[in-house]
Amino acid sequence: MVKNMANVIQTNNMETKIPQTKNEAFAQLDAMLSEKEKSELAKSDTIEYHFSLGMWIRNNWIYGQEEVDVKRLAKAFRMEILFFEADELSEKIIEYYQRYLKRIGL
């Protein structure tokens, strides 16, 4: 089941800044998602977010961005990008964000 995240779709037209660190990425996601969405994400399989949150991450933080910025983002999530793979990076960001949500008790 693909998770529909209304807030993600609403923010697609927002101007976003590609995060340079995990903390910046988490702060943007925290501001964008509702408490209910964060709670559901913390308990779900991350693959369920590939076509919602994952697509938003790819469209706003990866595709069309400067290579140096995307590499910095990948490095923040402990990924070395030799051959660019946007799906893997967006999945890794969601996995780390899910761990963060679990640590803060959601």
Task: Name the predicted role of every residue range.
Residues 2-41:
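N-terminal export/targeting and maturation segments
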Residues 35-106:
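Compact alpha-helical subdomains of small soluble proteins
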